[in-house]
Amino acid sequence: MNTKGYAALSAGSDLVPFEFDRREVGVNDVELDIKYAGICHSDIHQVREEWGPAIFPMVPGHEIAGVVTSVGSGVTKFKVGDHIGVGVFVDSCGKCEQCLKGLQQYCNEGMTGTYNGYERDGKTVAMGGYSNRFVINENYAVHVPANLPLDGVAPLLCAGITLYSPIKHWNVTKGTKVAVMGLGGLGHMGVKFAAAMGAEVTVLSHSPSKEADARAMGAHHFVSTNDPENFKAIAKSFDLILNTVSAEIDINQYLNLLKQDGTLVVIGLPGKPYAVHVGVLLGARRSMAGSMIGGIPEMQEMLDFCGAHNILSDVEVIKADYINKAYERTIASDVKYRFVIDGSTF
């Protein structure tokens, strides 16, 4: 079916209007009218081929919120008119241990990304959410609670689940001392989720101007990382540190902020490997771990939690012809806190 969107035609090129064909709605598929599509920093990395060879033309976008417009004859989970979300992957093998546990993002055969890859037939190029419509197997989409505005929902499908998953996995509850490194598109969701779960939340940021925002989102403390003395003052303070930063840092400074048995979870993808001083871990039985998005059951759990607690991403809604400027502003950290494209403008 004919689809209108925006695509990068080659590595590093500006995105331009682009028409392409999506598959027709199959027996187990749902079609959605895309209302909003979030801009993730990873979209920029992939358009610029900074994470390895990419497939062009590329229609980016894996933060998709819309309304169901048609369903296949075998669909049981959705009906026309439902609010629906699609995230970072659109398929997996469905048979391995991870998939059977609902951890499709760790599929042994590799998840099928929403874009910049091939669908499971190995031939069809996956095109993402910077477009006016989408078709997906019902098992890889999630229901959006009716009380949540779709513009603020779109980034939850990547930024939101990326923070919700480790917060749940490391059992954040009332009184847990959590630090969030960085207050950007990822970090601001970590603050909101951890605060809603009753944690004592500290934001660690090099941008003092963000303190008021951090506190408004639920943070109890704000520490500027520009002053080395501040690291000494909060040494051995945290049960869990969520690292959303992709810039080069001395990770050992932050590991020293963990209590005994504390864990630092790497979420932001650094440009270079960290140089970890093993003694920092051994001396207090600390751990350093990683986490990547979340599976379909956890995505649904997250959205239900957001519906119950009225949690949304802070967004700036743009028209499709502003995408290239939005990329520039995202790189310059000039957004509070996520750009979202109005799907009606494709």
Spans of features found by a protein language model:
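Adenosine-nucleotide cofactor-binding segment
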Residues: 174-183, 193-253
